[in-house]
Amino acid sequence: MRYHNITRDDMLNGDGLRVVLWVAGCSHCCKECQNPITWDPAGGLLFDDAAKQEIFEQLDKPYISGITFSGGDPLHAANRLDVRNLMAEIKEKYPDKTIWLYTGDSWENILHYAIMQYVDVLVDGEFQVDKKDVKLLWKGSSNQRVIDVQKSLRQTDPMVPVLHCGDYA
């Protein structure tokens, strides 16, 4: 896996103060994407032990709510296995921290992925410039959804996602 940045004390990409891992690799290539530099899966830096240690040092802080995986797309084929393994390690080491995941994929297409067992909140859907709204919380366009993954998976019909913010659209 490759990455472009690790952001500390982030308040824009999930609940509370978070650490954000911006991975390299995205096949969605959304028009007016905020991070087109992250599209190339060969771009950025190799995610090594030093990068993992930096994330763990942030997660050790009691005021950090959790980690957000963004990019790029953490579910890009070049990232999925490494992201899943890192999430599993984080859940084991930091069970009270939340994991957020941003992807251009839709919930309906990915809800059966093994990685979902580690995700608390998913922001799904491609950014659509014609639906851009800067007033939206945690997402860039109104087609995207902020989904409570674990509640959704426990439902009788997980295809209908439970939104993290209730009626918030």
Residue ranges of predicted features:
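N-terminal [4Fe-4S]-dependent radical SAM core
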Residues: 1-22, 35-41, 158-165
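Short pre-active-site segment immediately N-terminal to redox-active cysteine/selenocysteine motifs
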Residues: 25-29
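Short, conserved loop/helix-junction motifs that constitute active-site signature segments
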Residues: 93, 114-117, 140
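Flexible, glycine-rich phosphate/dinucleotide-binding loops
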Residues: 12, 108, 131, 155
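Structural recognition of alpha->loop->beta junctions
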Residues: 53-56, 60, 111-131
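Conserved Radical SAM active-site core
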Residues: 1-3, 17, 32-100, 105-112
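P-loop/Walker A phosphate-binding loop and immediately adjacent motor/lid segment at beta-alpha junctions
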Residues: 77-83, 87-91, 132-169
